Structure formats: structure tokens, C-alpha cells
Amino acid sequence: MLSRLLKEHQAKQNERKELQEKRRREAIAAATCLTEALVDHLNVGVAQAYMNQRKLDHEVKTLQVQAAQFAKQTGQWIGMVENFNQALKEIGDVENWARSIELDMRTIATALEYVYKGQLQSAPS
């Protein structure tokens, strides 16, 4: 009787050990699945962040190139406007010179006309 109780007790302990081992393996498998799922979820976020960073880097390079082109074009426009401004000043200078010459010519013409009229009046008729 004692040996039968001992065998039953050992059998129940073996069943409990097997059940405990089975549950331990299931817990390890579940923990592994959870870990893999978490890693996959984090990897998706990291991959997305990496792709976004690459896109941002590309956009920054494009923006730098366009900003440099804009600066160059702006410099060219400034040069053209300065040249145009200088040309307008020169045209204004020529216009003032022409007015001055015209005024001098009118003065000379008036003086010559005055002298001519004076000579006609003083000439014996």
C-alpha cells in the first residue's frame, strides 16, 4: 500500500513537472513571439524615420542648390539693374548736355541776329 501511494505520488509529480515544463515552453514561445512582434513594430518605426530622414536630406540638398541658383540669378539681376541705372544716368547726362548746347546755340543765334539787325539799321540806305 505504501509503495502504491509512493508510485501514485511520483506519477502525479511527474505529471505536474511535465505540465510545468509544457507551460514553461509555452511561456517562452509566447515571450519570443511578443519580443519579435515588438521588434518588428519598432523596426517599422525606425525604418520609416530613416526613410523620412533620407527624404529630408534630399530636400535639403535640393533647396541648397536652388538657393545658390537663386542667389546667383539675383546677383545677375542686381548687376543688370545697376547697368541699366548707369545707362539712364548717362542718357540724362546727354540730355542735359544737349539742352545746354541748345541754350548756348539759341543765345548765339539771338546774339548774331541782334548784331545782324544792328548792322542793317546802321547801314546807309
From Swiss-Prot:
<dbReference type="GO" id="GO:0048490">
    <property type="term" value="P:anterograde synaptic vesicle transport"/>
</dbReference>
<dbReference type="GO" id="GO:0061733">
    <property type="term" value="F:protein-lysine-acetyltransferase activity"/>
</dbReference>
<dbReference type="GO" id="GO:0008089">
    <property type="term" value="P:anterograde axonal transport"/>
</dbReference>
<protein>
    <recommendedName>
        <fullName>Biogenesis of lysosome-related organelles complex 1 subunit 1</fullName>
        <ecNumber>2.3.1.-</ecNumber>
    </recommendedName>
</protein>
<dbReference type="GO" id="GO:0009060">
    <property type="term" value="P:aerobic respiration"/>
</dbReference>
<dbReference type="GO" id="GO:0005758">
    <property type="term" value="C:mitochondrial intermembrane space"/>
</dbReference>
<dbReference type="GO" id="GO:0051036">
    <property type="term" value="P:regulation of endosome size"/>
</dbReference>
<dbReference type="InterPro" id="IPR009395">
    <property type="entry name" value="BLOC1S1"/>
</dbReference>
<comment type="subunit">
    <text>Component of the biogenesis of lysosome-related organelles complex 1 (BLOC-1) composed of BLOC1S1, BLOC1S2, BLOC1S3, BLOC1S4, BLOC1S5, BLOC1S6, DTNBP1/BLOC1S7 and SNAPIN/BLOC1S8. Octamer composed of one copy each BLOC1S1, BLOC1S2, BLOC1S3, BLOC1S4, BLOC1S5, BLOC1S6, DTNBP1/BLOC1S7 and SNAPIN/BLOC1S8. The BLOC-1 complex associates with the AP-3 protein complex and membrane protein cargos. Interacts with ATP5F1A and NDUFA9; involved in their acetylation on lysine residues. Interacts with KXD1.</text>
</comment>
<comment type="function">
    <text>Component of the BLOC-1 complex, a complex that is required for normal biogenesis of lysosome-related organelles (LRO), such as platelet dense granules and melanosomes. In concert with the AP-3 complex, the BLOC-1 complex is required to target membrane protein cargos into vesicles assembled at cell bodies for delivery into neurites and nerve terminals. The BLOC-1 complex, in association with SNARE proteins, is also proposed to be involved in neurite extension. As part of the BORC complex may play a role in lysosomes movement and localization at the cell periphery.</text>
</comment>
<dbReference type="GO" id="GO:0005739">
    <property type="term" value="C:mitochondrion"/>
</dbReference>
<comment type="similarity">
    <text>Belongs to the BLOC1S1 family.</text>
</comment>
<keyword id="KW-0496">Mitochondrion</keyword>
<dbReference type="GO" id="GO:0062196">
    <property type="term" value="P:regulation of lysosome size"/>
</dbReference>
<dbReference type="GO" id="GO:1904115">
    <property type="term" value="C:axon cytoplasm"/>
</dbReference>
<dbReference type="GO" id="GO:0005769">
    <property type="term" value="C:early endosome"/>
</dbReference>
<keyword id="KW-0458">Lysosome</keyword>
<dbReference type="GO" id="GO:0072384">
    <property type="term" value="P:organelle transport along microtubule"/>
</dbReference>
<dbReference type="GO" id="GO:0005829">
    <property type="term" value="C:cytosol"/>
</dbReference>
<dbReference type="GO" id="GO:0018394">
    <property type="term" value="P:peptidyl-lysine acetylation"/>
</dbReference>
<feature type="coiled-coil region">
    <location>
        <begin position="1"/>
        <end position="31"/>
    </location>
</feature>
<dbReference type="GO" id="GO:0031175">
    <property type="term" value="P:neuron projection development"/>
</dbReference>
<dbReference type="Pfam" id="PF06320">
    <property type="entry name" value="GCN5L1"/>
</dbReference>
<dbReference type="GO" id="GO:0005759">
    <property type="term" value="C:mitochondrial matrix"/>
</dbReference>
<dbReference type="GO" id="GO:0032418">
    <property type="term" value="P:lysosome localization"/>
</dbReference>
<keyword id="KW-0175">Coiled coil</keyword>
<dbReference type="GO" id="GO:0031083">
    <property type="term" value="C:BLOC-1 complex"/>
</dbReference>
<comment type="function">
    <text>Acts as a protein acetyltransferase. Negatively regulates aerobic respiration through mitochondrial protein lysine-acetylation. May counteract the action of the deacetylase SIRT3 by acetylating and regulating proteins of the mitochondrial respiratory chain including ATP5F1A and NDUFA9. Acts as a regulator of mTORC2 signaling in response to hypotoxic stress by mediating acetylation of RICTOR, thereby protecting RICTOR against ubiquitination and subsequent degradation by the proteasome.</text>
</comment>
<keyword id="KW-0808">Transferase</keyword>
<keyword id="KW-0963">Cytoplasm</keyword>
<dbReference type="GO" id="GO:0032438">
    <property type="term" value="P:melanosome organization"/>
</dbReference>
<dbReference type="GO" id="GO:0099078">
    <property type="term" value="C:BORC complex"/>
</dbReference>
<keyword id="KW-0472">Membrane</keyword>
<dbReference type="GO" id="GO:0098574">
    <property type="term" value="C:cytoplasmic side of lysosomal membrane"/>
</dbReference>
